Swiss-Prot record:
The keyword tRNA processing does not apply. It comes from Francisella tularensis subsp. mediasiatica (strain FSC147). This is Chorismate synthase. FMN binds at R125, S126, S127, N237, A238, G278, K293, P294, T295, S296, S297, R319. GO terms for cellular component: cytosol. It is an enzyme of class 4 (lyase).
Amino acid sequence: MSGNTFGKIFTVTTCGESHGDSLAAIIDGCPSNIPLCEADIQLELDRRKPGQSKFTTQRKEPDEVKIISGVFEGKTTGTPIGLIIKNQDQKSKDYSEIKDKFRPGHADYTYFKKYGIRDYRGGGRSSARETAMRVAAGAIAKKILKHYGIEIYGFCSQIGSLKIDFIDKDFINQNPFFIANKNAVPACEDLIHSIRKQGDSIGAEVTVVATGLEAGLGRPVFDRLDASIAYAMMSINAVKAVSIGDGFDCVTQKGSQHRDEITQQQGFLSNHAGGILGGISTGQDIIAKLAFKPTSSILQPGKSIDVQGNDTTVITKGRHDPCVGIRGVPIAEAMLALVLVDELLITRSYRD
């Protein structure tokens, strides 16, 4: 299987399955002498890990990361950084009834058609469990970006039809929904409770922002910065759409409204472009929005076929998120960090 490595200079290769022994990653191209310890990475993993609230999956994985190479006396050495996380709360028996069935809306069917074999336990390699290593790698990328004054944060901006206004950035990590609005918590709780009672799931929108960037990151034509961001975000499980800046709202805007005018004293007067023009950063905040589909693992029966092509019905057991977009926030942050640190290193190589 190819397609397990991301990046050009700062590269991340992941391996592991949902119910396998471990998850692992190799991060290559990291500059030397970056202060790094397991606690730095664990802070980010703890934001993503399952089983932290009644609003996400009840699979309880500690996601304790171990650095096995590339760090000496608390600093990166410039050699490949090896990371490993042991899976500890697998319940593979929950999936025994679907080992010969394809769950509708999942990658079961396509993996089987491509490889002629699949790990049916929790989706195997196609499971969002894989994203734990992305978040771990993203934690390292964030440390590098911080050195250059670049900060990344994300938040859940919509759950189902419930749009959530951005009020307080500091509140994002103080609630289980990663929302920036304290007043919206009760509505989010009621919505998720209602969805769970129905044995169903719901989609979500996640917004991710990068601040403190200089102008000039990114390359034309096929390596545009916004193209790289979209590529990274679309690689996240359950993401079905990505927009930059005003995104699809630009369809109804006029040019006189959408163009981001500039003055000598005030700089850019707006940021409809989301911090990117011509595939290159403007120095403004980079803003991306991701649409997460509702998970297909629900308690309601659905029509499908088995490996012999016979009609069947599937009811998914196991422990699943009623809204996968909630835990998608730290994953989106990690992928944006990986894109930006790679582009930063590429830009430095051009200038050097």
